[in-house]
Amino acid sequence: MDSSTAALATASAKLDAVAQQGSSSWIGFFANIILGIISLVYSILYSVLKLTTFSIPSLLYTLFSTSLTVTMNATTLMLIIVLVFSLVSWFVRYRYLNMYSRLPPEPQRKEPDVDLFPDTHPGGSKPGLSNYLDEFLSAIKIFGYLERPVFHELTRSMQTRKLIAGETFNLEEEKGFCMVVDGLVEIFVKSARTGQHPVGESCSIDSDGSDEHEEYQAGNQRYQLLTEVHNGAPMSSLFSIMSLFTEDIKLRHGGDEGGEPTSATETYTSSRYGLGNDFSDQRESTVSVPTTPQLERSSSHGPTLHDGDANPSMGGRVPASIPPMSLDPPLQSRPKRPTTSRHATTSVHPDIIARATVDTTIAIIPASAFRRLIQIYPKYTAHIVHVILSRFQRVTLATAYNYLGLTSEVLHIEKSMIDNATCQLPNFLRGDALTRLKEKFNHERERIGEKDCTKGIALHNSSTGRRRKSTASLRKEAALQAITHGQRPSSVTASPPLQPRESGNKHTSNSGDLLMNIQLSRNGGRRSTSNMDPLTRQSTLLGSLETEVVSPLSQRTSNPFETRRHAHISLNKRETRDEDGLFRESILECMFKAIGLTANGTGAREPDSADASPRLTSYDQIRRGGYSSHNAFGFIDPYGGSVDGDADSITSGGTGPGLPVNPHALAHDMRDEVEIVFFPSGSVLVEQGERNPGLYYVVDGFLDVCMSAADESSGDILKASKNESSLNIGPGNQQGSAGRDRFMDANLGQSSSRKRASNVRRNVALIKPGGLAGYVGSISSHRSFIDVVAKTDVYVGFLPRQSLERIVDRYPIVLLTMAKRLTNLLPKLILHIDFALEWLQVNAGEVIFHGGEESEAIYIVLNGRLRLVEDRQEGGVDVRGEFGQGESIGELEVLTESARSGTLHAIRNTELVKFPRTLFNSLAQEHPNITIKISKIIASRMRKVVDDPSTFVGKEGALKASLNKSSSTLNLRTVAILPVTSGVPVVEFGNRLMGALTQVGTPNGATSLSQSAILNHLGRHAFNKMGKLKLSQYLADLEEKYGLVMYVADTNVNSPWTQTCITQADCILLVGLAEGSPEIGEYERFMLGMKSTARKVLVLLHADRYAEPGLTRSWLRNRMWINGGHHHVQMAFRTQSVPINPTAKRTGPSLKERVQILQAEIQKYTSRKVRHSPFYSPDAPFKGDFHRLARRLCGKSVGLVLGGGGARGLAHIGIIRAMEESGIPIDIVGGTSIGSFVGALYARHADVVPIFGLSKKFAGRMASVWRFALDLTYPSASYTTGHEFNRGIFKTFGKAQIEDFWLEFYCNTTNISKSRQEIHTSGYAWRYVRASMSLAGLLPPLCDEGSMLLDGGYIDNLTVSHMKSLGVDIIFAVDVGSLDDDVPQAYGDTLSGLWAFVNRWNPLSSTPNPPTLAEIQARLAYVSSVDALERAKMTPGCVYMRPPIDEYGTLEFGRFDEIVQVGYKYGLEFLQKLRDEGALPVVEETEAKKALRRTMAPRRASI
């Protein structure tokens, strides 16, 4: 053994040595590898051969040759079969048929939080120099947009003054413009209760003596606190500034100028308020304008001033021979204008003093700065006056008229303005000429009939179309000629001096023919015009541009006006149209004279010299070509322009107050703008609440200035004296039970035009021949406070508003004259109200007040939108309301002196009127009856709260998010259409939506704005600073004129127009392509960067009327800022690969853009894409998606609420079919129980045909006894498992989500975990429909995020209240619930169960059966639902329907066809009955056809 072991060891050692030697070389290494591979292959081949040839055959032989015997009894066999069946059933039941439970989780979308800007000034204003500048700039915002030169001119002589605490400051003596820069100033007004009560016995509103700080006594005179002026607010009122600008403006012009209406105003004011002699004397001195030297000179027409009229302080340096409003040539040497006050002027605000509460710094812009501004920048002076007049109309007059009930005062202003704006036609047009004019209209009246005469008959003017057609080309030609002759100076001294004409000539009847009389009356104006070269006339007057190339007939008409050599032409040799032209021309001259546009007084003050002004001279040198755009109405000059557009906007483009105008030449050249119109007696020329179509001049007949008698029901607020007619209107009573507190009712003229036509009107004033109608409203572009009705057959001259606006823009004297008249005609009360009212301009996101703060003012929205939010206890905020134009906020808190209930912030840039509490207290003490109007507003608001059923469930968490959606959809004034990304056809979308809005009929109409429309309006100011002001004013005017303004963002994402669309929007429609990428687009990023807090709505455009399940959720998942819902809209479109309006480049489009355009064009002809037909197309226009969206924006949506009732709810299908056949659109659907099932089907398909088949299939499943029996389980929570029920609903809806439904849908459930109602608007449809149908006991509650949901009918079986809270106007509510058995019970104090059982089966018993335990539980569950049903029936705008389905049981789904037919027949009969009675609330969707009563659209007379 040892020897063998040794041998093996020796052999192994040898082998190791050999291996070591082999491994030391590469050859040995590779040899070992090869040998190993060969050995492995050999082993594998051997194993395979052995397995196939020996092992497998041996195993098969053994298996087949073996015998197996299995012995099993019947019990074991049955157990095996049951086990296999159970396994298969479990797989089918819980793995195959239970797919609905394995859907990916899609929880309900949470209501997005409201976007709020961070409060940048939580602790008040910050000190320092920057604060000083900010407060100063905010104070002078009242002047509008101030350009740099004007700002410097105003501020270079500004003074500051320190007031210590308690120091008084007499504003009556201060002639400049005062503002508070730092501190607090109280403004007091002299109390009319002087001597009525001893000191300390004041008539206080409160009982706690809080008015002690609101009164101030100086000697025996008591003062009442009017307002408090904080940092950045002006101490002077609007009329303080206007009085400075209009010191030298005459109230009336010409020979018919009478005395100032001092006595009338004084008598009216004294009798109105019982004012003492103190006020009368001050008003007398205020209105007594002839004490001013310049006005004395202007009205006297004499060569010199009276010596006694000169102010001694002026040292006799005022030139006696040069009136400030003269067109005479300037003298060679003119004295320098003194810097001191030129004359003592009584303050516009008497009886007013200021007292500093703390140490205060005030800034004063002296009156001399404003006088200097008039001379240097006359055009901008008129702009400031226009801004002030506009704000006075919108702030003071509108508030006094509609909010305080001061109707008499406002209408007295209208009457006084009518008395001052009169001018008689020349006598030569009063006799035979007027008779011939009437004959022309009489022939036309006989031809067309009396019925069409109410529209008005306009005299035909053949040259109107030719003039308008050639205007643009003539302007270009004149501009080119002006550039060619550019060396001619543009100052007025280039022409010979104009001779002043005799004012009395026009009213003197001279011998001779007609033209002699005309020439004698116009000997001055046309002579100077004829002496000018043609080019001068082209650059001075628009009409001369137009008459250079007109027909010879028109030239022949204008020739007699130039020289006397044509005076011998007889009238009978002229054509009749020349006489019509004379009428038009004379009417225009009278209009010009009445509004202050005369040759002897065309401005506030004549400048020293147009050539000597260093600013004008330097400006003329800067201009290239030397051509100044002095056409009459400031038309856009297509060729001439200034180097500096901003300077051009200030110093040129208009005839300043000191530059002369020839009204005769202007009237001759503009005569084609005038229409001579006949109105029969009773015709309405101007309606209250609408914008004046133009200016009416009464040629013959009488016009009544009226108010609707229906507006007088509120009575006289301030108790006018017995000898004075009551003129108060009270439009608040017309606002209905809804109580929307609009002090500027935009619907007034449109919605109630037919009603007002039939109402009895109360006469306010009479306009006689020579008077003007629509004077104030036309010039100020504000809505009319009055009706103008033809008292007799009347012949009027009509100047359209567009033409009048050009005159006002060109000649500032028109505005200044009206401002002068207003400042001298206003009652004292209106002046004090104007002083206390504060105009605020709030930036987007700025907080007006916080919750819990003291209520110190009422806010009225002039323009913009506000949102009131309330903090949640668990964090975040809830929206309590949104307030648009004309609505007021905070009356209840101010009257009750309670803290603010929430935080108010601006959604966008907003203009507000701040009505301070101190003013309200002052008015209440001086005139206690003035509080009646505000009390009515608060009472109507409280009535709305009581009547609104949603307030009863307002504290429940389910409805907090939607309680105030009604306020978000009501009173929308601006809507922006913003694409998600480039390539979305927003222009086509906007055009279709605009068409739908027109057909739906928005109040006051709607308009659409695009970049091109804005550029056309801005003209040459589109790219300078003045354009910003013009744009903001233009947009504000559009919001007042139209009920809805739509902004279409049709430019690139970074363009200013896109930014404007976002900042101006109350609601932003984000339009995207449903089939496109749901990623956030560049426009959305830009919108988010601007931090807009406007309500945002997503609109998805579909090629087909179908939305894939889950598509909408993919869009909404990343857009938490969508807080206004979403809409699905079908619109055929072609995707654009280039921007909508690509920016034009100087070098032309890039190569890439050209290729894209060519590809798009080629693809239109080469694409072979098969377009599938839409799933469903609406067969009626009222069902169109754009109409549905339009109704939603206008607050005219139609809602359908379907109640629960089991199988009885199948009648909903028939009623929906009847509504479709009756032409009633359905925009929003809500349902409970079976109503949620039928409503969800209709909301998904928006058609009755699909819901019929799907509902019948579901009813068949519910009627199957076997399915019900197989679903039974141990009744621990319910009798069934709910699987069959779930399966039936899931097979109907599949994976569809509520967001994918074509119509807006919601359903309600009862959350028994939190004991409240839940509203579901997102998530899987089948889950929440099933939860809404879960009858307790029959089905188990549905678990949703830890809460158990049951049938929503337990709390509210007819969700009308929630539908109303969504902002729906008309609601059709269908109730199919079972009727409660209210038979009186008398079974005693105890009840035997055995007796009850016997009595139930005893046919001879007359005792009613007592309710069972199940019936008692069911009635207990539906207690709250019964109360909600009664409130729903009383909801305004709700149409309650209950078909006769009481005979059908809750589970009788097998009678499907019968129940549907019952609902269909009932629906047809019910709707037909409403239509026959005229009570069908849905208005036909046709364009509004209104009777044309104005002059531009009547039937013209054939002459």
From Swiss-Prot:
Gene3D superfamilies: Cytosolic phospholipase A2 catalytic domain, Jelly Rolls. It is found in: Endoplasmic reticulum membrane. Residues 252-348, 454-561, 722-745 are annotated as: Disordered. A nucleoside 3',5'-cyclic phosphate 1 binds at residues 658-777. A nucleoside 3',5'-cyclic phosphate 2 binds at residues 821-941. GO terms for molecular function: lysophospholipase activity. Residues 1200-1364 form the PNPLA domain. The keyword Transmembrane helix applies. Residues 262-272, 285-302, 487-496, 506-542, 552-561, 723-737 have a biased composition (Polar residues). Residues 1-25, 93-1503 are cytoplasmic. This is Lysophospholipase NTE1. It comes from Pyricularia oryzae (strain 70-15 / ATCC MYA-4617 / FGSC 8958). The lineage of its organism: Eukaryota, Fungi, Dikarya, Ascomycota, Pezizomycotina.
